[in-house]
Amino acid sequence: MALPVLVVDDSALARKILINALPADWDIEVQQASNGTDALKFYHEGKASVMFLDLTMPDMDGYQVLAQLKREDLNVFVIVVSADIQPGALERVKQLGAIAFVKKPASTEKLVPILKEYGLYE
């Protein structure tokens, strides 16, 4: 059964680059969201066991999404993928429950070790 994966970024190009960086042989069903509100909607519909999340988005940013997921005690593996590397960002996303922080652009080489570490990809 395909693993539901959600790619969240306000940039369609960034979503495309990230999707292309996912392992080609990974059995997944990918959904896309362009903002945090839609990301939470997809999650509540059961379409996100793994979420690749940008931090800087209109409407609801990645930090707000992480905070809401944590408040609701939701079970999802969140990998933050962002170009916004501000001091303290890594610590903040980890405190909010993200399993990893990947600097854009994402690549298969950056993602596979994280996915393997959490048993999401073999």
Language model: regions and residue ranges:
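Two-component/phosphorelay signaling modules centered on CheY-like receiver
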Residues: A12-Q31
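Acidic catalytic/metal-coordinating carboxylates
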Residues: N35-D38, D61-Q64
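Active-site beta3 strand of CheY-like receiver
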Residues: G46-F52
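Receiver (REC) domain active-site loop signature in two-component systems and cognate sites
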Residues: M57
